[in-house]
Amino acid sequence: TAMGGLNMNALELQGLTKHYKDFTLGPLDLTLPGGTICGLIGENGAGKTTAVKLLCGLYYPTSGEILINGKSSRDFSSDSYFNLFSAVFQDYYFMPMTIAENICTASDYDRKKLFAAFDKAGISEKINSLPLKEKTYMIKDVYKDAADFSGGEKQKLLLAKAIYKNAPVLILDEPTAALDPIAENEIYSRFNSFVQNKTAIYISHRLSSCAFCDKIAVFDNARLVEHGTHRELLGAGGK
């Protein structure tokens, strides 16, 4: 891995803030020991996704520190920092390219590894049913012969993309598009089985979907208002 064999990356946010014109996130303080699965919950606009994009280095914080195994994010080269995270965000758009090109770059293409990722994400049956398999184009508006994917199948492709990258820290933004409960449950359990021995963050709107997480942090109004285990938060009357 990017950390010289360290797959259990401890994450720490120290007084992290982000100022926009009319919005300030934080200050956020959160410690996740290596190997923790943490749920981040809160309403839309509560700051969860912004916090995670700060953690991934996609946004720069206004103040505060991010530590990975005690080392400041500022002390990493941008490439080595980027390689620490596999993140699946809901605002991701598939490009009008082949399925394979949407999952990995040409220089990184490994067919065996790609199909292992499809398998773990539960989408290999669909890919194998297509005449051109992973070389099938996506996006019907651009290519007449492109494959159609349901909301649940797109989620699985996003999960396959994160699995293919296989970074030490995995982040999954809960599907905002309504998936049926069975499809949603399948995404949780596949995510859960894949993140064994990794540090993982699961972004959700509901406490109930984070029952599998070791720790849950609750966002409200751009602040971290409480954190604990699923049971502790239920006991505290968490929403």
How does the language model describe each region?
Residues 64-71, 81:
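Conserved ABC transporter NBD signature motif
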Residues 43-46:
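Walker A (P-loop) phosphate-binding loop of ABC-type ATPase nucleotide-binding domains
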Residues 56:
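Helix-to-loop junction immediately C-terminal to a conserved catalytic motif
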Residues 170-174:
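Catalytic Walker B motif of ABC-type/P-loop ATPase nucleotide-binding domains
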Residues 13-16, 23-33, 64, 134:
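Conserved beta-strand
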